[in-house]
């Protein structure tokens, strides 16, 4: 038979361990990761060759990444139904025009299944005039797209130098990285 005190202490220990495992042991208010907003940027330095592709554009022309050779390119993977993508696109439009004369280009890659019927009115509504292409399964896999929006910065030599996952909501986050590679 169990003694009542032993059962009581066992129960208290179990409850305490459960609370600690759920809430953690430390004060998370000083932990930067605990303060990161849900749509915060995830950026990574990359040094690998960007896979070339040939994708259909909104003008119904085949466009390849190699046609941007010698430029710094920001590939923006997005969809019309993605709210954070809608926040980023006007920022990318500004960046495209701000740095175009310095050899920079934004290339949007839509993952929408409806393609032209949905994408064309969407980009007209946002006044987007940088090139928009339609993703295929291969480019989606080669660039390891796991979230939208995802932006991939490619340097003049065709190397992937930076990757942004999620919406930064801030032009400055992109400016710092773009200017580094111009």
PLM feature spans:
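A short beta-strand-turn-helix
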Residues: 46-47, 52-73, 99
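Thiol-/selenol-based redox modules, centered on thioredoxin-like
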Residues: 34-36, 153-182
